[in-house]
Amino acid sequence: MFYSHLLFFTFTFACSSSLNRKTKREMDLKDIILDTCHQNAACAHIQMHLKETYVDELCKCGRGEECPIHWDPNDGHSITQAYNQWKFCSPISQDLPVCTREQTAREFSYEMNPVSKKVQMFMFFNCLCPENHFYEFFNEREETGGGQLAIIEERCEKVKQCEKTQICQKIETFQGKFLFKHVKCFCPGNQNCNDDLKKADATNVGDDGSVQHYMKCH
């Protein structure tokens, strides 16, 4: 099945005809194509951890426009939620409605480029998840026409309160640089989820050299 799942803070791409799940960093360059953005598609995703940011470019702007890949919630080209920011080639409406529980919040369109025969993903927002919610996969539609392979749909799911000793977030670094954070739950009461990598409750080194830092509430 052609499937890709984005949990609020991590991108996973289904790429090429093999339809294997790989992170963008794990793909060979021949598997990746940054095509011209469709209208209203996000051109980049930025995450901030303390003062460090990581940029994941999603597509290229056309008509002489550039994707504004610097953190700026006031540039008129951004949707900002917590330490996530999505960028757009053209000014984006700041009046997107808050999603209802049953509404499709975000869509990913996977398409085959007719020239290169490589897969490109485009991301579209229909509405914004409310505070303490994340974007969660709920439906996949396989397509057969117009070069489109599949559409992934996400809804808003509430982030649950952490249980005692539960990991509240995972932060990944590569060669000492921040890549992304994945929040798993929110800390109760006056507790906060640890952000200090030096005080991680556990770490794991991946085959590609990336390091996962597992944090608990303190």
Curated annotation (Swiss-Prot):
Key words of the record: Cleavage on pair of basic residues, Disulfide bond, Ion channel impairing toxin, Potassium channel impairing toxin, Secreted, Signal, Toxin, Voltage-gated potassium channel impairing toxin
Name of the protein this chain belongs to: Kappa-scoloptoxin(11)-Ssd1b
Localization annotation: Secreted
Signal sequence residues: 1-16
Propeptide: 17-25
Lineage: superkingdom: Eukaryota
Keyword Signal: yes
GO cellular component terms, A-Z: extracellular region
GO terms assigned for molecular function: potassium channel regulator activity; toxin activity
Keyword Signal: yes
